[in-house]
């Protein structure tokens, strides 16, 4: 099977297994070429549903995890989304496909080399609705706040206060919490109240920063 056939096969499998359901998420995963975000020696593994090393101690998330996170966040066209942990840019591209031209993805990456490479790939593929910023993602990005949705691609000890502040009322935040025994947590902001839902066990790299783990 060529890469396109492998992509269709893995997405059909994820639909059968219940990880992805909505047309928006399915279409986005079909559209984004995961291989473009990988180092040359890993391109042939682009549609193996597993995390892959991308350098600097970081990974690209498994395809099912990206799809599941998009479903849990209930992303919609026109939304402004904050992503903490750009990595190679794949997750940002999938999010950008869903929010569309009228939406915006603001992605923060603490490792300059990864940010630069991700931005190059995103530009090459035409994702002009993604802004990549080098910085401490645990502090969010105040200049473009508030956000409809926020998610992190790394696990922190708790949800950082700056991210809660930068979330719109009615907005949703999704992040893995914990160091070794991690849980994926969905938080919804309702006025001064934060409603927390546990979405199950996960395994992510640590979220490093002032409001995260110390690097």
UniProtKB/Swiss-Prot annotation:
Query: Catalysed reaction(s)?
Result: [protein]-L-isoaspartate + S-adenosyl-L-methionine = [protein]-L-isoaspartate alpha-methyl ester + S-adenosyl-L-homocysteine
Gene3D superfamilies cross-referenced by the UniProt entry = Vaccinia Virus protein VP39
UniProt-listed GO biological process terms: methylation; protein modification process; protein repair
**From which domain of life does this come?**
Archaea
Molecular function (GO) terms listed?
Answer: protein-L-isoaspartate (D-aspartate) O-methyltransferase activity
SUPFAM superfamilies for this protein: S-adenosyl-L-methionine-dependent methyltransferases
Listed InterPro entries: PCMT, SAM-dependent_MTases_sf
Please report which protein family the annotation says this sequence is part of.
Answer: Belongs to the methyltransferase superfamily. L-isoaspartyl/D-aspartyl protein methyltransferase family.
- What NCBIfam families does the record point to? pimt, PRK00312.1, PRK13942.1
Q: What is this protein called?
A: Protein-L-isoaspartate O-methyltransferase
Organism of provenance: Methanocaldococcus jannaschii (strain ATCC 43067 / DSM 2661 / JAL-1 / JCM 10045 / NBRC 100440) (Methanococcus jannaschii)
């Amino acid at each position: 099977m060529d890469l396109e056939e492998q992509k269709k096969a893995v997405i059909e499998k994820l639909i059968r297994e219940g990880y992805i359901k909505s047309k928006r998420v399915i279409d986005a995963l079909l559209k984004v070429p995961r291989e473009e975000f990988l180092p040359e020696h890993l391109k042939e593994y682009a549609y193996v549903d597993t995390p892959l090393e991308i350098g600097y101690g970081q990974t690209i998330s498994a395809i099912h995890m990206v799809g599941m996170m998009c479903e849990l966040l209930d992303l919609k066209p026109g939304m402004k989304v904050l992503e903490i942990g750009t990595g190679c840019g794949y997750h940002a591209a999938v999010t950008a496909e869903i929010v569309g031209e009228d939406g915006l993805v603001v992605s923060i990456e603490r490792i300059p080399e990864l940010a630069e490479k991700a931005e190059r790939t995103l530009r090459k593929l035409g994702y002009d609705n993604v802004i990549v910023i080098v910085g401490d993602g645990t502090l969010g990005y105040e200049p473009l706040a508030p956000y409809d949705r926020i998610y992190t691609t790394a696990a922190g000890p708790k949800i950082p206060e700056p991210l809660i502040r930068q979330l719109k009322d009615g907005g949703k935040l999704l992040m893995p919490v914990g160091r070794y025994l991690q849980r994926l947590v969905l938080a919804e902001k309702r006025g001064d109240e934060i409603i927390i839902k546990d979405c199950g066990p996960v395994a992510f790299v640590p979220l490093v920063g002032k409001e995260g783990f110390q690097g």
